């Protein structure tokens, strides 16, 4: 399973990505494939490793609030150290359902993870470090394997845009360790581009176009290497992405909005804690929750607003005018009292690429826009129809 971070389906053309395109031509292209909402990386890496929505796996965003880890603010799930702390305080329940690594092990099979993405997204693919473990740019698990990995692959290269040196090194790791040494039954390969480049440089930029060319060449190298090893006829290849991508034009933040409108005491106060789009209200105060929802609903850059279901399974939230957590499979013990979405449009950027959201930044993802929701899935191999 090859995850090309942030790969929009419309990036994949014969001209821009000939190797990925050709794989689809000899296999299948899933035109209606979709990301899990919120359309952020660690929510979806958890879904890859569990087959579940956040309502079951418990990773609610790229940043999550768990009082047992930090009572005053949310923490980034991009750092594996934070997730290890969550794993510790929950008795091994960083993800609250069984993972693929565990399921494969119970069947006598091995998982291996090779990733140039964040340590957090890598950890969530195999949090119990089953099979051949994890080789990531920022960490190696089990730690006892690090010296051997560094000896085989050499030092970790400096970060670049596109992040070609790191991506090449991690694919070398897949081949030399995941395939040659462990003979893994299943491998997750996570390539940090085009996301890594598109965030600061934008969709359609020279740099992002170069990133697409680079990752396509690396996919081609991987496929040729498997063929040279005589493994192409017995390997099913899935190329996917964790989310799509949009141009971002927003200038505002939810904490500032709530403070300005008098429903949060200060940016640092704990009466209301904001963790990305999730809002946690002290003691789940229903009046405060309703007041915050009303502020959000009257703000033009805020899109859909979600609250706990009025009744279990209902599409309507408990606060009038909101959708329910159940409608997006987000109801979990770690869920906030409110979840917000940013507004979005079909507007094109200066390079002609459609999809614009009112999140802050140059380009990114996270909303319910079809340009964020619609991700890539291409598959080919002996077990897949042609």
List the predicted regions and their residue ranges:
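Second-shell loop/turn segments in exported
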Residues: 6-11, 35, 86-91, 101, ...
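Secreted, luminal/periplasmic, and some membrane-associated catalytic domains
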Residues: 31, 38-40, 62-89, 127, ...
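Stable alpha-helical elements in mature extracytoplasmic
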Residues: 3, 7-8, 16-19, 29, ...
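Beta-strand elements within well-structured catalytic alpha/beta cores of enzymes
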Residues: 1-9, 22-24, 48, 104, ...
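Short, structured active-site-proximal loop/turn typified by the sulfatase FGly-forming signature C/S-X-P-X-R
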Residues: 10-59, 63, 110-113
């Amino acid at each position: 399973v090859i995850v090309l971070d942030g790969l929009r389906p419309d990036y994949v053309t014969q001209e821009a990505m000939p190797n990925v395109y050709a794989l689809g031509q000899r296999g299948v292209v899933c035109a209606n494939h979709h990301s899990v909402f919120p359309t952020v990386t660690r929510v979806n890496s958890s879904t890859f490793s569990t087959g579940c929505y956040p309502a079951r796996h418990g990773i609610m965003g790229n940043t999550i609030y768990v009082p047992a880890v930090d009572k005053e603010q949310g923490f980034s799930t991009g750092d594996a150290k934070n997730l290890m702390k969550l794993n510790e305080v929950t008795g091994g329940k960083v993800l609250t359902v069984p993972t693929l690594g565990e399921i494969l092990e119970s069947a006598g099979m091995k998982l291996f993870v090779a990733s140039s993405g964040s340590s957090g997204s890598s950890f969530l693919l195999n949090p119990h470090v089953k099979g051949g473990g994890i080789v990531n740019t920022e960490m190696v698990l089990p730690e006892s394997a690090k010296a051997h990995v560094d000896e085989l692959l050499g030092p970790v290269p400096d970060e670049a845009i596109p992040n070609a040196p790191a991506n090449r090194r991690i694919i070398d790791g897949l081949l030399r360790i995941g395939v040659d040494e462990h003979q893994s039954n299943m491998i997750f390969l996570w390539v940090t581009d085009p996301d890594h480049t598109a965030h600061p440089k934008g969709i359609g930029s020279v740099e992002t176009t170069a990133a697409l060319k680079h990752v396509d060449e690396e996919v081609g190298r991987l496929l040729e290497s498997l063929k040279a090893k005589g493994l192409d006829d017995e390997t099913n290849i899935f190329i996917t992405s964790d989310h799509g991508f949009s141009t971002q034009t927003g200038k505002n933040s939810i904490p500032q909005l709530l403070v300005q409108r008098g429903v949060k005491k200060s940016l640092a106060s704990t009466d209301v804690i904001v963790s990305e789009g999730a809002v946690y209200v002290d003691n789940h105060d229903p009046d405060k929750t309703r007041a915050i929802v009303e502020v959000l609903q009257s703000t033009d850059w805020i899109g859909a607003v979600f609250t706990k279901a009025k009744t279990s399974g209902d599409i309507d939230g408990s606060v009038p005018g909101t959708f329910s957590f159940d409608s997006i499979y987000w109801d979990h013990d770690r869920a906030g009292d409110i979840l917000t979405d940013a507004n979005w449009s079909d507007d094109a950027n200066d390079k002609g690429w459609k999809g614009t959201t009112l999140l802050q930044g140059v380009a990114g993802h996270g909303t319910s826009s079809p340009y964020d929701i619609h991700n890539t899935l291409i598959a080919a191999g002996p077990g897949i129809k042609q």
